Amino acid sequence: MKSFAAAFAAAVLWSTPALAADPVADRYAAAMKAARWTGPLLASNAETLPKGHVYTEPYFFDGISGSDHHPGTSGFYQYGLRDNWTVGVQPFFSLGTQRHNREMAVGDFKLLSQVRVSHFTPDHRAPSVAIVTNLVLPTGKDDHLAALKQGHGSGSFAPEVGINVQQYFLLGNGRLLRARVNVLRQFPLRHDVTGRSVYGTGPDFRGHARPASKTTLIAGAEYSLTREWVLAFDVEADAWGRTKVVGRDGDGPRIRSTSPRSWNVGFAPAVEYNWSDRAGAIFGVWIVPEGHNTAASVTPAIAIQRFW
């Protein structure tokens, strides 16, 4: 009996390290429970929604470039198709501010799809990683424009692929720093163009255009100041290839134009307030200095998020 008890005690002693809780995991779990997030202004989540749940986050903004204002609304409306697969739509609407153009216009919508391949937990502290496959729809008007009217679309279907990464870092004060990285590449397809268009063609033009490809790199960070308040900061770099337009203006000679490449780098400080685990708001400003063949702009924005 004594030998059995000794053997049992030895087994317990040997197994205790394997069964004992990971103190770092415990600290991560406590910190994650004490933090609420909206997400930064620009960088997207690498997580997916639980199956059957819905996420809504409408954005309201005013893009300011020089003396021109371009107010509008966009956002994310997503559904958990599977626990590791989220789909959704990103609409875009803008409001004309010119005296002859004060109506609401529809821009290009984007269909969203994201498959998560890795999931951060307090016990498994590898980054969350998701593969992104989106599709831009040519819902905005790009040609057949009346005189003095602006276009709000590209006219092109544009597949987009990328990767989203998200990681948590536990700081010495017990609060969390959450970091995100997004890498995206967009490939617009060739499409027909008729008349006045966003590509600068005249009223009698007939031809086609291939919009520039676009590469986007976003790095974002959020610091959980308190349970409700979060400080956020994003840096986004965008690079565009060459847009090509080919056709004829009426009976004139064949036209072939190619735009130069362009790029810019902007940043977006923001403040989040989350009044519950399911709802919050963010206010920030996206500031883009003048880049290579791009104008400077300042875009204040506010968004309200809700998990259903």
Summary of predicted features, one role per range:
Residues G39-L41, G52-V54, P71-G75, G107-S113, ...:
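Hydrophobic, lipid-facing positions within transmembrane beta-strands of outer-membrane proteins
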Residues L19-E57, G63-I64, T121-A126:
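Outer-membrane beta-barrel biogenesis signature
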Residues S44-G52, N84, S118-V129, L170-L177, ...:
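Short loop/turn motifs that connect adjacent beta-strands in outer-membrane beta-barrel proteins
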Residues L95-P211, G252-R261:
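Outer-membrane pore/translocation modules
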Residues D204-W308:
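Outer membrane beta-barrel transmembrane domains
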Residues I64-H70, L95-M104, N173, R261-S262, ...:
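Solvent-exposed loop/turn segments connecting transmembrane beta-strands
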Residues T56, G75-Y79, L111-V117, T133, ...:
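Residues on the lipid-exposed face of transmembrane beta-strands in outer-membrane beta-barrel proteins
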